[in-house]
Amino acid sequence: DGTLYIENLRDAKTTDVYTLKGEGEEIWEPRFIFHGFRFVAISGYTTKPTLDNFTGKVVYDDIKTTGTFESSDGTMNQIFKNAYWGIRGNYKGMPIDCPQRNERQPWLGDRTTGAYGESFLFDNQTLYVKWLDDIKNAQTADGGIPDVAPAFWRYYGDNVTWPGTYITVADMLYQQFADKKVIEKHYASMKKWIVYMEANYLVNDLMTKDKYGDWCVPPESLELIHAKDPSRNTDGELLASAYYYHLLQIMKKFAAINAAGTDDIKYYDALSERIKSAFNAKFFNLKNNSYGNNTVTANVLPLAFGMVPENKESKVFENMVHEVEVTYNGHISTGVIGTQFLMRTLSEFGRADLAYKLASNTTYPSWGYMVKNGATTIWELWNGNTADPKMNSQNHVMLLGDLLIWYYENMAGIKSNPATPGFKQIIMKPDFEAGLNYVNASYESIYGLIKSNWKISRTNLVWKITIPANASALVYLPTTNASDVKVNNEKVSKSYQIEKNKLVLELPSGSYEINANNIKQ
């Protein structure tokens, strides 16, 4: 109706008042404040204002943009732009949840996996190194970590999924930037929290403490904030136990990296095995090959974390796919926790096409639904255009999950080899079969600019890549026939491998044009 929608801002003051002194040209800019907004209402102006009379200035940390992404899917491209603006607007010396309502807090759970995806778009290393210090400083004497740090809001809920961000962000800094210092600096504090949670909340080898559940799953009604249908929600003990197991695997890696932690590896191994055994004993349904109440989240977590009995993985995955494709008609049904691993798990187990469907949907619930309804950032809720304004931010990034990671690693094929952190060796393995016709992406790594620009025309692939100095790449092509492949217009030599129906080249730094005919999709 032409009026501003401010009901969802709660009691945040959204009005700036300036009194003209009435002498010539006057220029005014507010200080010590920022507003999150899309539209502005002007009153008291003596003439009809024009856009030239006002300048909107972006207030965010001085962080370099490091990533670009474009594909053949316009919806995916706009989602990327929305993510860029949303992330950018929430960098304020710490990663906050929203820039507009009376909150603006650095919630840990919003960045558990989000920090990883953001690292492809922005050089966020310094920001997150500093944030780890904030988290460490907020830790209690007995080891507890808050849900918000710095702990302006003193939410010491002692759940697993939000405080666990302390560990996952350190892992992101190591994987993306080869930063070992954060592990050395924070290892003792992270272990202290692990031990604290075990001592206080581990009962019969299962983690009993959970606070938020799979936060913000798409509700059954467009007017609801949270789902009331129990079939949509995942058991908190299942979530917490699986996530705690996942964090123990990261801590085991940290212990191997950090000389002071090598004696702890046996501790993490033993605790992990106990939890895995108890987890499967309680939550795995042998008859149905599913976990808990068979939500997508209940199944995706044990799949992503390697907790499923080896001979049951394919069955559990089939169950999960059935839920996505049939029960939810090819749409998202996960909340903040499940969405962190959804896209990559679908691709890893061979359904990149289904992941692409989720990424390109424009009907509720989906990221594309936000775009279709005029969003220019990412909403707090999947139904942000209709939900109760009590909790309905129009600029949150927590629902991105692992989408941006999937964009870069699975669509563009720009992934750091875990064995050589910081993109010393790049794994270039796009899911060509997903359904896109082309992707053009770049990422400014610590070694330099990485480019991946591929285009498929029927059964022919043209792929232009750039590998920075002092780095190398494993390049995966959708063929097993080397005679169909040329690199810089030269036939492939004998120095290649065949791995799971893909031809793999190891290339040193440089720029290449790869042509592959008769490719498999």
Positions of PLM-derived features:
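Alpha-helical support elements that line or immediately flank enzyme active sites
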Residues: 1, 29-32, 43, 110-138, ...
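Repeat-solenoid scaffold signature
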Residues: 327-369
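Helix-terminus loop motifs that line ligand-binding clefts
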Residues: 3-13, 125-226, 363-384
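Structural helix-adjacent loops and short alpha-helical linkers that scaffold large soluble proteins
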Residues: 45-53, 76, 80, 119-133, ...
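Conserved hydrophobic/aromatic pocket- or pore-lining residues that grip, position, or stack substrates
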Residues: 40, 83, 114, 135, ...
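The feature captures the catalytic groove of carbohydrate-active enzymes
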Residues: 7, 14-16, 21-22, 94-98, ...
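Extracellular/oxidizing-compartment recognition motifs
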Residues: 1-101, 109, 126-127, 146-150, ...
